[in-house]
Amino acid sequence: MTDMTRRNVLKASAAGAGAALVPTAWTAVARAGSQAPPQALAAGDLALWYDEAAGTDWLRALPIGNGRLGAMVFGNVDTERLQLNEDTIWAGGPYDSANSRGAANLAEIRRRVFADQWSQAQDLINQTMMGTPGGQLAYQPVGNLRLALGAASGVSQYTRTLDLTTATVTTTYLQNGVRYTREVFASAPDQVIVLRLTADRANSITFNATFDSPQRTTGSSPDAATIALDGISGNMEGVTGSVRFLALAHAVTTGGTVSSSGGTLRVSGATSVTVLVSIGSSYVNYRTVNGDYQGAARTRLNAARTVGIDQLRSRHLADYQALFDRVRINLGRTAAADQPTDVRIAQHASANDPQFSALLFQYGRYLLISSSRPGTQPANLQGIWNDSMTPPWDSKYTINANLPMNYWPADTTNLSECFRPVFDMVRDLSVTGARVAQAQYGAGGWVTHHNTDGWRGASVVDGPLWGMWQTGGAWLASLIWEHYLFTGDVEFLRTNYPALKGAAQFFLDTLVTHPTLGYLVTNPSNSPELAHHTDVSVCAGPTMDNQILRDLLDAAARASEVVGVDATFRAQARATRDRLPPMRVGSRGNIQEWLADWIEPERTHRHVSHLYGLHPSNQITRRGTPQLYEAARRTLELRGDDGTGWSLAWKINFWARLEDAARAHKLVRDLVRTDRLAPNMFDLHPPFQIDGNFGATSGIAEMLLQSHNGELHLLPALPTAWPTGQVSGLRGRGGYTVGVAWSSGQADEIVVRADRDGTLRLRARLFTGAFTVTDVSDGSTPATTRPETDVVQLTVRSGRTYRAARPGVTPTPTVTPTTPAPPTTPPTTPPTTPPTTSPPAPSGARATYRVTNSWSGGFQGEVTVTAGTTAIRGWTVTWTFANGQVVNQVWSGVHSQSGANVTVRNADYNGALPAGGATTFGFIATVNGSTNNPPTNLTCTTT
């Protein structure tokens, strides 16, 4: 489409990133006798798997990424396709979005708004406040790497899997008596995409590989084993494309031959092949595009070429699992998990499939790790995956819901590092937004409206109905303080404080006194994407603005105290905060969306912006503001449960904050349907936007742990559909790592590790009955108080772990995965011989090893570590396998394996044990043949 046509389509379909296109549901039919394949079992059911290739359907392909590089893997037998992205390939180039006519017309715009002349105000905004250009620029693809492998006939036993525990896509099938296997992963340590092809018959792999792209590109063969694609990003909105990129694909073979000419890579008669894909970009930052993109691509490829496949894989796993393995969750398993993933989605409404909620939760974490790493761009509307030159809403950053939602799970699900790109962006926007603040408002500080892009556009775009919203930068800046509440990192706060202060300063300069109400209000602004009267959204002081600014000004004031600066500014911020309009309850018993008690023309609108105060903020709480709490419930009832995918996901979080477990779980189930999840579990609105995935992960976390109200509230919205389960590794504000195990709908055991000294307040039903609290580090019983019947309070120390439990509950601060079903045969009977036990150590610990389940080609085991006569701070268990067993996954421990020798060290929450205390870790392993002898040299050492 042309730019103008595209913009008109946006407006016709409601312009904001949450606007829904016509739903196009898909179908999948259950397989009789279906069983999960070995790859899914090895992942403890944390895998997406299918018995059919993706064909040409992008929403059936499987995503991999390392934060910077992304690929969609199709898994076709005849032609493998890797659709490639690099996170800095944006249309156009650096531009100044500020409109110099804005400041001179601002007073008249405000007069019209206060006079209820909203249409006339919007007309003047269109003439004088729109950015230059009037739309922002799109995230674009690199292209495709295609491997032509031959005919797809004679294929059986086809399986395609995305293993969330290893971040690897595996395709395997039998063709003409040969077992072919492909593995694809994106390595963050080595900054390449790795495609590994193997066959169980020598000299069976033959293919031709080529690049293609919708961009302006040139293909070539720089050497005898490499092909190249050199290109430049597209033009858009009158801005010339200026991001150069180079993609390289290099083949290393065992057996056979490899050659390259004319942009085609030819492999013939190989037994195994490793294809390395490296991509370089000339994008340096939002102002500079003259980077050595060719040198970057070649340097990364050359470095990866010196590393064998085993080391590439092990480095990738060590990096990825250090993040992913922090959180374990088990919500139970039923036979529904034996169906392919697309079937599970299609039949979810009529099935009991609690494990799918765990899979959905962990998939969101996987996607965030794969699309957002330190030093990369933030995850955009599609994360990092896009195959279109003109993707929906440009696949950029929509700030009035979508970008913040992408990062709601970052801190709560223990992925703090993945949050860093957002703060890099905020610092960039404090520069571009300062230019807009001065030119369009005559103000200091900085401002960003409802969207930004790779060039950090900060002005009003897409028309005033959507774009004339002032508090985008304010919301992003408030995330600085929110992140600090989790981490306690004063240096982080000091580094980002200028951006936080600048966002607040803009509103100190621009808020105006409402002529009749006397409050300080934004003008002009809107309640995101929703008209209050026909075709007009512009107003003064919408409720969401007031809520965001209350958070922003409070955060800026508190941050200035922590870093010890700006006492005068601090006082101004607090005085301004106190003059903001309070939330009001309207005539329908709802939270008013605007200062006036208007009834919205679109009553089931996807945005519920005026409940920002309920979530993600803490301005509306059950115990602190009961009247507003009930009004928030009424607001949600009026808005209804339906909506776009991301809207449903936000509503999970809302209902979790209302502690309504049944309604929150209903919305989790509502999200799992074929018009809201694609076959590859990408969230649909439709079309695909990734924020729904992240919002769902956040919502499930909120159902299990909340920390926004000065306490850790365990299982605040636990549904009856999850009667028994465990979760560990969640994070709470105040610097806590939390685990909880439950049965019959209430906690049996709570484990909390403190990052810093302080007072810990715990709320759970557990405390309404008999319980014990133990300092696990030394076995002592800390003093506790009971300020409420379901609350205990105690003093905690940094680095120590505390356990609360019902009497008689064995110390097991771990999460046990669901027992996997066998792939083809019933499980064998666990060994009747006594478990293997390490030599006793009276003042140390002993380890007991046993097999708990087994199947053809694999087994599940567990090891219990029991402290001796003295408390321990940490433990390490080692053993030697006798039959070529390989550990694929460990929970509640950190493992490595060298040959037959396995080492498992404690996780961060279960190393400290009191005298006589015990903890258990589990694992999944593969085994060649039927012999699975107990290990030798089992030892346990302690610190």
Task: Describe the predicted segments one by one.
Residues 2, 8-28:
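N-terminal export signals
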Residues 205-213, 753-767, 871-882:
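Surface-exposed beta-strand/loop patches in extracellular or lumenal glycoproteins
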Residues 840-943:
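Extracellular low-complexity, O-glycosylation-prone Ser/Thr/Pro/Gly-rich "stalks"
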Residues 188-195, 199-200, 735-761, 861, ...:
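Carbohydrate-binding surface patches
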Residues 36-465, 482-484, 515, 562-565, ...:
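Aromatic-residue-lined binding/catalytic grooves and analogous aromatic/hydrophobic interfacial grooves
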Residues 810-841:
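Ser/Thr/Gly/Pro-rich low-complexity, disordered linker/stalk segments of secreted
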Residues 61-84, 88, 108, 128-129, ...:
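C-terminal capping/lid segments that line or modulate ligand- or cofactor-binding pockets
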Residues 762-778, 878-891:
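Solvent-exposed beta-hairpin/edge-strand motifs
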